[in-house]
Amino acid sequence: MQTGVSYFSSRVLRHVRADLQDILEHGCTYVVHCFTETDLAYYRETMKGVVQATHDAGLEVWLDPWGLAGIFSGETFTRFPLDHPETWQVLSDGRRAPAACPNHPQTRAFLRGWVEACAAAGGDVLFWDEPHFYAGLWKGDMSGAWACRCDVCLGLFKDRFGYEMPAEFSNDAKAFRESSLLDLLAELCRSGHEKGLQNALCLLPTDLSAHGFPQPQERLRRALESRLGGAPPGAVDSMLHIGVGDFDTAASIPDLDIFGCDPYWYLFGTDAEKFMRVYGQAAAAAAGKRNRGLQMWVQAFSLPEGREDELRTGLRVAAQVGATHIAAWSYEATASMSSIRCPRPDLVWNIIGEEFRRLREL
């Protein structure tokens, strides 16, 4: 059992080294370092030092394209779309969204450059973190407009389906979005392997109702009815379709080594045991068919006070479904980020340490 935690707290090496010792003492075997666009622009050599310090501590280094191009998740900003406005995604209502289109050639060239930077830094694993098209729901946009209908996507859609892309969200639009992300990931994973890096993919839980969790969909529908007087056609489905729901196809990416998901039951307002088990079993089945490692994440941010012990439940279920890699987001219960830190970070971090040490003894 490999146990890890994400880290973005410092670029000052003496502080990083101290934190790495703390991470070791909490039972971790790997660290998921966020390698952002800020790092690409200003901290490339510094990141080499961070990677080396992590290796010196005896920990494996995973590198996360945190927030890159607005395609991968992360509480950080992206500059690439500002520098390349021609890559912006276009919403179904004609508005332009400040995130780069995964299908645009310049976006792909930029992301391949990130892979090269990770190889130069000496990383071990590329962690492809929740790839998705622009998610208006995350920005408070309740219109139901979805991406992407840029010229590149319109052309690719017509080539594949033989007709013009509809403005209303449909099964074909959903399939196109997923296949676009998977095609991008296949290209990036191939690039990673060519440079001697492993690849790990983490997908968000999606298709919630089909997996037995109708609550988020119903909450969103009620919110739209309250705010707009009703949900526009396809709005609920488009707003909740974030990422890739086809686990089997995702796990089949040829150059993928580790497949997983992050069933954050607090975030989705669901039961810890059931949510982790349902999505964990789905991820395990997909990973098992392709002989991939299985990674499961638990939420150590925005964790409600008084529910900290549910982490023990989530980690226990992750082990039961056969996870080879378990991780928590993020270091010290995200204490350094005030907007999403846990109310009692010390308690959360201690629970993670206790459970990680226990899991490694199994």
PLM features: what roles do these ranges have?
Residues 128-169, 206-215:
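Active-site-proximal loop/short-helix segments
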Residues 256, 261-270, 295-360:
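Substrate-binding cleft of secreted/luminal carbohydrate-active enzymes
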Residues 3-7, 31-33, 61-65, 126-128, ...:
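Hydrophobic faces of well-ordered beta-strands that scaffold small-molecule active sites
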Residues 7-11, 36-38, 66-70, 131-133, ...:
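Active-site beta-loop-alpha junctions enriched in small/polar residues
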Residues 9-40, 120-125, 250-259, 317-326:
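Catalytic domains of carbohydrate-active enzymes, especially glycoside hydrolases
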Residues 60-121, 157, 161, 165-173, ...:
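Active-site-adjacent "subsite" loops/lids of carbohydrate-active enzymes
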Residues 62, 162-305, 314:
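Glycoside hydrolase catalytic-domain groove-lining segments
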